[in-house]
Amino acid sequence: GLGIRYTAHDEVPSVAEFAQRVCSRLLQRADSAGLQPPRLILEPGRSIVGEAGVTLYTVGVVKRIPGLRTYVSVDGGLSDNPRPALYGAVYEAVVANRADQPPAEWVRVAGKHCETDTLIEEAHIQSVQAGDLLAVFATGAYNYAMSSNYNRFPRPAVVLCADGRAELIVRRESLEDLVAHDIIPAHLS
């Protein structure tokens, strides 16, 4: 399907450009193989909702290592956005409660899971401190669908914001949700 802009550097073709590229190559291949042109149906994929999603994280610890880098740990990670770990997906972020200020530092955004859990390798963001809200853009396509209870972490809530309103459309999972299907054998209880 058609891609989206995850970062300001991403170049995404228009629908017409994408169709022209795919169709011209497909027609060339069919012709060179002596085949009739096939009927091609493409799904729009992430282009419908990808850019509409923004994930908000609360900043936990900010660790500044002079001469090396600054790490910003957040209250999410691999369980709510596995794409950086699985595909090397790249995202951009802003400190939401300071979005009106210019970027001030380069940081690495780390998730809360026990293994290498890096959400963003290099983010140019506003000055950041514990308790800030970090907004990560273009998370509307696959984040929720790919989220999991990895390491027994509950999934976050999903809020629909439109026309000046914010409405809860998926509630945050609770401890009860996490253990709802667990069974303790009688001899162990």
Feature-to-residue mapping (PLM):
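Alpha-helix-loop-beta-strand connector modules within alpha/beta enzyme cores
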Residues: 18-31
